[in-house]
Amino acid sequence: MNNSDIKALIAKIILFSLIGVAFWLLTPNAGLITYAILVLGAIIWLIYETAQKKNRHLIKHGILMGIFLMIFDFIVENIGFFAGLWTSPQSLYSVISVPIEIMALTLIGGTAWAIHLPQKFDKAYVIFESLIFGFFGALGEYLLILNSMMVYTNGWTSVHAFFGYIITWLILFWVWYKVIRKNS
């Protein structure tokens, strides 16, 4: 990992911490503003990444990753919903069980995430990044639960979510480096 990779990891920790503090400060009455904060954060991140000249050649690849993440998340969220593990009861509009705001977040945030990744696969980076997303993903879901935006059922817990996010991010890294970026 080089210095810019370390800075990117630190920037994500800071961004996700700020979002977490905003959720916590608004608890228990945050409601739909939680989704607005997440989507706005993803939009700002995407604007930042695409504004950098060095990243412009990655935009099409990034969009493919965003689409992949949106579809992957849609499938996983619906499987969990129909298995009775969780539900997201509040949304402007849901597609089956997935809030449209989460679909926007995964598309936009997934695109920004892919664009910022190191040029070459880096095992240490993958491990740290997966742990960051595991921790903040589980924490984010916990805060959504506190704000009545999500409900766990039938024994699903934040620990399950933590490992689910880690597995998801390992899959995303594999798709990015072995499929989408393989020939570029």
Give, region by region, the residue ranges found by the protein language model:
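Aromatic-rich, lipid-facing transmembrane alpha helices and their immediate juxtamembrane interface loops
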Residues: 1-184
